[in-house]
C-alpha cells in the first residue's frame, strides 16, 4: 500500500513537471515564429513600396500616352487643315491660270539685229509750286537761275507764281546686246519736258513739249573695265555725280551757269578703269571728243550746225580723272576747243578777234562722313560760254566760280541742305565783248536752303533760293545790282 501511494505521488509529480516543462519547450518555437513574422512584415512593406512606385510609373506612362494621343490628334487636324488650304490654293491657281490663258500674250521685245536685248523704263514725276518776286534768266519756275537786270529782255519786277511739271523725266535703258565675245552693248534714251510750249495761245502754258536730253550707246568690256560711249551725253565738265540736291531745280540745277558748268553734246567718250579689279581707291580716266558749239555768228546760226564751233573740224576735247573711295570721291577735268568766229561760210566780220581758244580746268568732290553730305566744285576758264560758263556770255572772257552744298540727314526720312554758288567773269573782258545796248553780267551769287522728306519712292521738300546779280547798265557805263527770291513746294515720285 505504501509502495502504491509513493508511486502515485511520483507519477503526479512527474506530470506536474512535464506540465511545467511544456511552456519552456514552446518558448523557442514562439521566438522563431515571432522572427518569421517580423521578416514577413518587412518584405510586405518593401513589396508594397515597390507596387506603389510601379503604379506611379504606370500613371506617368498613361499620362504620356494620353498627351501623345492629343498631340497626334492636333497634328492630324493641322495637317488636314493644311491639306484643305493647299487644295483651295491649287483651285485658285488653276482659276488664275485659266484666266491668264485667255489673255493674248504680249509681243516679245526684239530688235531683229540684237537678240536678247532687255528694256527698262525709269524716271520720275515732278511737280513744283513756286512764287518769285522777279523774272529770271533762262525762264521762271524750274529753270530760273538769276534775276534779269534792268534793261534785260523779258525783265519783270512783279511777283510770278505757278506750278511747274517740266522737270518730269523718263528714260529707256537697253541692255543685253552682244557686240562680240568680249564686248557687250547697252544704251539710253532720255527725255524731259523742257522743249518749250505748244504754241503761244491761251492754253500753251499747260502743254510743255518733250525734249531729248541724252541718246547714246555703250560698248563695254567687263574684263578690262573699258567702255566706249557714242551719241549725245553730258560732257566731262558737267559734275554729274556732284550736282547739288534739289527737287525744284533738276534739269537746271541750283547754280547752273552761276557756279555749275557743263552741257550735253554729241560725240564719243572713252572711259577706262585704271586699276580694274583691284582693292582700295578706284581710279578712272575719261576722254571725250565732242561736237563744237558756239552762239552765232548770226541770229540763225545756233542750229543746223552753223555755229562758229562747227566751222571746220574743231571738236571740243575734254579729259577727266576720277578717284573714288569708301565715302568720298574727287575729280579733276580739263576742256579745250578752238572757235572760228568767221563762221562756217568764213564771211562774218570779226572786229575784235577772228578766233579764240576755249579752255577750262575744274576740280571737285563729295564726302559723306556719317550723316553729313558735302559737295563742292571750283573752276577757272576762258571763253567757256559754250559750256554754260561766263554767265552764258560768249566771247574771250575769263571766268572763275564754283559751289558748295552741305547736308545733314536727321534720319532715313528727313534731310536739310544749304547751298551757295558764285560765278565772276572778268569785268574788262565782259565790257569788251558785251553786246550793244545790253547789260553786261559781272557777278552772280546764289544761296539756297531746303528741308526734304523722303519715304520709299516719294520725295517732298520746301526750298528757298536767293540770287544776287551785279551787272552794267545797258550803255556799259553804270553799275547795278539785282536781287530775287524764289520759294517752292515740291513733290517727286521715282519709278
Residue ranges and their predicted role:
Residues 2-31:
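Gram-negative bacterial Sec-dependent N-terminal signal peptides
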Residues 18, 30-138:
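N-terminal periplasmic/intermembrane-space "pro-region" immediately following the signal or transit peptide
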Residues 290, 391-393, 490, 495:
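Membrane-topology and secretion signals of cell-surface/extracellular proteins
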Residues 312, 323-441, 445-446, 453:
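Detector for outer-membrane/organellar transmembrane beta-barrel domains
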Residues 450-464:
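C-terminal closing repeat unit and adjoining cap/tail of repeat-based domains
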Residues 453-455, 481-495:
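Outer-membrane beta-barrel "beta-signal"
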Amino acid at each position: 500500500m505504501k509502495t502504491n501511494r509513493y508511486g502515485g505521488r511520483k507519477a503526479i509529480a512527474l506530470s506536474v513537471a512535464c506540465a511545467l516543462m511544456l511552456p519552456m519547450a514552446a518558448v523557442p518555437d514562439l521566438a522563431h515564429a515571432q522572427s518569421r513574422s517580423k521578416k514577413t512584415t518587412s518584405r510586405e512593406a518593401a513589396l508594397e513600396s515597390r507596387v506603389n512606385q510601379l503604379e506611379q510609373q504606370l500613371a506617368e506612362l498613361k499620362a504620356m500616352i494620353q498627351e501623345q494621343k492629343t498631340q497626334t490628334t492636333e497634328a492630324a487636324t493641322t495637317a488636314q487643315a493644311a491639306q484643305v488650304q493647299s487644295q483651295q490654293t491649287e483651285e485658285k491657281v488653276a482659276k488664275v491660270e485659266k484666266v491668264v490663258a485667255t489673255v493674248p500674250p504680249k509681243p516679245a521685245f526684239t530688235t531683229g539685229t540684237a537678240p536678247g536685248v532687255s528694256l527698262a523704263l525709269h524716271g520720275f514725276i515732278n511737280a513744283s509750286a513756286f512764287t518769285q518776286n522777279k523774272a529770271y534768266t533762262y525762264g521762271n519756275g524750274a529753270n530760273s537761275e538769276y534775276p534779269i537786270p534792268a534793261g534785260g529782255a523779258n525783265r519783270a519786277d512783279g511777283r510770278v507764281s505757278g506750278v511747274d511739271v517740266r522737270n518730269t523725266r523718263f528714260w529707256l535703258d537697253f541692255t543685253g546686246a552682244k557686240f562680240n565675245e568680249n564686248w557687250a552693248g547697252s544704251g539710253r534714251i532720255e527725255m524731259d519736258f523742257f522743249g518749250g510750249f505748244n504754241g503761244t495761245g491761251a492754253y500753251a502754258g499747260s502743254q510743255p513739249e518733250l525734249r531729248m536730253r541724252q541718246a547714246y550707246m555703250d560698248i563695254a568690256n567687263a574684263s578690262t573695265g573699258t567702255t566706249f560711249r557714242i551719241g549725245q551725253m553730258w560732257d566731262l565738265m558737267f559734275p554729274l555725280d556732284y550736282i547739288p540736291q534739289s527737287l525744284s531745280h533738276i534739269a537746271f540745277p541750283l547754280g547752273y551757269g552761276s557756279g555749275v558748268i557743263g552741257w550735253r553734246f554729241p560725240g564719243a567718250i572713252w572711259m577706262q578703269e585704271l586699276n580694274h579689279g583691284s582693292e582700295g581707291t578706284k581710279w578712272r580716266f575719261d576722254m571725250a571728243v565732242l561736237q563744237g558749239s558756239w552762239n552765232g555768228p548770226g541770229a540763225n546760226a545756233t542750229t543746223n550746225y552753223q555755229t562758229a564751233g562747227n566751222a571746220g573740224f574743231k571738236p571740243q576735247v575734254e579729259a577727266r580723272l576720277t578717284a573714288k573711295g569708301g565715302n568720298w570721291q574727287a575729280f579733276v577735268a580739263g576742256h579745250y576747243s578752238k572757235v572760228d568766229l568767221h563762221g562756217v561760210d568764213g564771211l562774218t566780220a570779226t572786229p575784235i578777234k577772228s578766233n579764240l581758244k576755249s579752255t577750262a580746268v575744274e576740280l571737285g568732290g563729295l564726302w559723306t562722313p556719317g550723316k553729313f553730305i558735302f559737295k563742292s566744285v571750283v573752276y577757272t576758264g576762258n571763253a567757256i560760254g559754250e559750256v554754260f560758263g561766263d554767265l552764258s556770255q560768249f566771247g574771250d572772257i575769263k571766268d572763275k566760280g564754283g559751289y558748295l552744298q552741305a547736308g545733314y540727314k536727321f534720319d532715313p526720312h528727313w534731310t536739310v541742305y544749304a547751298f551757295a554758288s558764285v560765278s565772276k567773269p572778268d569785268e574788262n573782258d565782259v565790257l569788251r565783248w558785251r553786246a550793244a545796248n545790253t547789260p553786261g553780267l559781272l557777278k552772280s551769287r546764289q544761296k539756297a536752303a531746303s528741308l526734304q522728306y523722303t519715304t520709299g519712292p516719294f520725295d517732298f521738300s520746301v526750298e528757298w533760293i536767293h540770287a544776287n546779280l551785279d551787272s552794267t547798265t545797258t550803255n556799259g557805263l553804270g553799275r547795278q545790282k539785282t536781287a530775287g527770291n524764289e520759294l517752292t513746294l515740291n513733290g517727286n515720285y521715282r519709278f
